[in-house]
Amino acid sequence: MRIQSLLLLGALLAVGSQPPAAFGRKKGEKPGACPPDDGPCLLSVPDQCMEDRQCPLTRKCCYRACFRQCVPRVSVKLGSCPEDQLRCLSPMNHLCHKDADCSGKKRCCSSACGRDCRDPVRG
């Protein structure tokens, strides 16, 4: 019984010592996020990568227009963007490009008319 208790304690300590970011990521997925993909697909070219581990250093494998390539990652704030129920009648206008462009805990979220800074929702 004592050996089983020690093994269980060791397993719990191993899991508890993992950084929180490790949970929720696929194996081989690097931390951070892909930058927004605003480019139109003008020319179909072969993917340069299929997953993050094929990219050097801290770069991530992300869609850019219509193919995947290794790009610098961006940091992401906690929470998720609220769902947008609107339709846009004017041209797109981006007030931010990444979370770091927004103050405090606000996130750079896509809306019907572009991206803007919004308070995140839990999730």
From Swiss-Prot:
Organism: Aotus nancymaae
GO CC terms of this entry: extracellular space
Record function comment: Putative acid-stable proteinase inhibitor.
Main location: secreted
Keyword annotations: Disulfide bond, Protease inhibitor, Repeat, Secreted, Serine protease inhibitor, Signal
GO molecular function: serine-type endopeptidase inhibitor activity
Residues covered by the WAP domain: 27-73, 74-121
Signal peptide region: 1-24
S-S pairs: 34-62, 41-66, 49-61, 55-70, 81-109, 88-113, 96-108, 102-117
Gene Ontology biological process terms from the UniProt entry: antibacterial humoral response; innate immune response
Location(s) in or outside the cell: Secreted
Identification of the protein by name: WAP four-disulfide core domain protein 5
Gene3D superfamilies: Elafin-like
SUPFAM superfamilies: Elafin-like (SSF57256)
